[in-house]
Structures are given as structure tokens and as C-alpha cells.
């Protein structure tokens, strides 16, 4: 049974607008000279900077209003990206359930248009983001019944592009992806350093015609971006939930160079948006 669509007020959409990628319309937008997409880093955290109670433990932090905001953000990006750990732990759908009233007139995108109705006749968003899974060593053992695949099959989302270093791609996995419109994206072996080569990943995403990507996690992905790759991030949108998860959680704490006498990264041009019991912090990485 289809999940109920979410609603996000137009007034709140406008407060977020300065921190979002410019709308893309193939009919009116000139080709972008950039080799990288617009990157929004977004996640929900506790008051003690934790994403989850522990590795592999799915932990709900966002309230209903900020959850609806996340689905609105998905309509404003061409792609949504998570790491393999999140794909394994959460079996995410990586789609948007936003009702069209909140987003239909806001943005035009390069692909991913779809529309569905629930049992009450509510129209669901006209745009779906392309899921991007970063899985260098093909750890994610997806099947036709994985949520993102099922949603793609039902027309309520898109099949993922899986970024990997592995050359020996399983034939049945490749065929399953292709049957739903997804595929593997192979990075060159020179990037097999055991670390995230974000410039290579983002360049590969842009080469697929995707102008913007929101990166949602998990912890290793977020920390690697906020560290030495912070210059690649255009916007940061963080939902802060009024809860402490306690010691042992997966935290946002990017690596700092030994002996460095300044913070790893700092936000500028900040906006605070209260949403229910949560508060959302929007900003840009200070250059």
C-alpha cells in the first residue's frame, strides 16, 4: 500500500530557497560549464551530534515537519546520494512523497518526472531524484525486492546508479538495474585508494546529466565531506532534533589535521528554521 503523501508549507519553501540549487529547465537553462553538480549536504542529528544510536542501527530523529522538508529537498535536486552503509542498514526508498501542492511550481528538472496518487486521491510529487549509492566494493546485496527497486518498478521512484570500483560486475545485478533504468558507474582503478575521492564521484554524477545532488549520509560519507572535501559542498542543511542519544552513537565529527589550530569547517550565511520540535540550520561552508 502506498504511503501517504507529505505536505510542506510554501512559506517554509521560500525560507529554504537561498540555500537550494537554482531550478533547471532543459527548455530555458543554458548548458552549465561546471564539471561538478551543486552539492547539498543534509542530515538529521541529535543535540550530541549523533546520527544514530550505533553503527547499523536505524534511528529516527526528524519530526513530521522536518521529515516533510527532507522530501521537499529531494524534489529540488536531480539526485540523492547515500553510502553503502546506509543502503545496507536502512533499505531506503530514496524517493519523494511530497504532495504536488508544495513543489509543482517551484522547480523543473532534467529527468525523474512522475506522478502517483494514494487512496485519497492526493497527487504525489512530479519529480523524483535519481538515487546514487556509493558502493566501492559492491557490499550492497540488493534484490528486486529492495525498497528502492520496488518503488522504481511501481513508478514511485527511480532505480539507483551505483558508483563502484569493481570491474567484475555480477551479470544478474547489472540486468536487474538496467531493467528498471538504473546502472553501475565505474570509477577508474586509480581512485581505489580506500578513501572517498569526492571530486571523481561528483564528476561522474555530473557526466550523467545530473546538475544537483543532495547527500544524506551516513556518518563516514558526511565526515569525509566536511573534512578535506568541504570546498566541494555548496550548501549544508542540518535538522537538529531535541534529543541526546548518548555515548556510542555514530557522530558527525570530521577528521582534523594533527596540530591544526582552527576548526575543520564553519558555516556562513546561516538561516535557522524552526519546524515543530526540531530546528533546521541552513548555511554555506565559509571559504
Descriptions of predicted regions:
Residues 1-287:
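Enzymes that bind and transform nitrogen-containing heteroaromatic metabolites
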Amino acid at each position: 500500500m502506498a504511503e501517504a503523501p507529505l505536505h510542506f508549507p510554501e512559506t517554509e519553501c521560500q525560507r529554504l530557497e537561498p540555500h537550494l540549487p537554482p531550478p533547471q529547465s532543459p527548455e530555458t537553462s543554458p548548458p552549465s560549464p561546471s564539471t561538478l553538480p551543486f552539492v547539498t549536504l543534509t542530515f538529521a542529528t541529535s543535540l550530541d551530534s549523533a546520527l544514530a544510536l550505533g553503527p547499523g542501527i536505524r534511528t529516527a530523529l526528524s519530526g513530521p515537519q522536518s521529515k516533510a522538508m527532507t522530501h521537499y529537498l529531494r524534489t529540488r535536486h536531480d539526485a540523492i546520494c547515500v553510502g553503502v552503509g546506509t543502503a545496507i542498514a536502512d533499505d531506503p526508498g530514496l524517493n519523494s512523497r511530497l504532495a504536488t501542492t508544495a513543489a509543482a511550481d517551484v522547480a523543473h528538472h532534467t529527468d525523474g518526472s512522475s506522478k502517483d496518487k494514494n487512496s485519497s486521491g492526493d497527487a504525489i510529487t512530479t519529480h523524483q531524484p535519481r538515487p546514487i549509492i556509493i558502493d566501492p566494493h559492491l557490499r550492497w546485496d540488493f534484490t528486486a525486492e529492495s525498497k528502492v527497486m520496488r518503488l522504481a518498478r511501481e513508478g514511485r521512484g527511480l532505480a539507483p546508479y551505483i558508483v563502484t570500483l569493481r570491474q567484475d560486475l555480477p551479470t544478474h545485478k547489472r540486468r536487474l538495474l538496467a531493467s528498471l533504468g538504473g546502472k553501475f558507474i565505474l570509477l577508474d582503478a586509480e581512485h581505489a585508494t580506500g578513501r572517498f575521492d569526492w571530486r571523481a564521484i561528483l564528476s561522474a554524477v555530473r557526466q550523467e546529466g545530473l546538475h544537483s545532488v543532495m547527500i544524506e549520509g551516513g556518518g563516514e560519507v558526511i565526515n569525509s565531506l566536511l573534512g578535506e572535501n568541504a570546498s566541494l559542498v555548496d550548501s549544508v542543511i542540518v535538522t537538529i532534533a531535541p534529543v541526546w542519544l548518548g555515548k556510542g552513537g555514530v557522530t558527525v565529527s570530521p577528521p582534523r589535521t594533527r596540530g591544526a589550530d582552527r576548526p575543520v569547517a564553519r558555516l556562513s550565511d546561516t538561516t535557522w528554521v524552526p519546524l515543530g520540535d526540531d530546528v533546521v540550520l541552513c548555511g554555506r561552508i565559509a571559504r
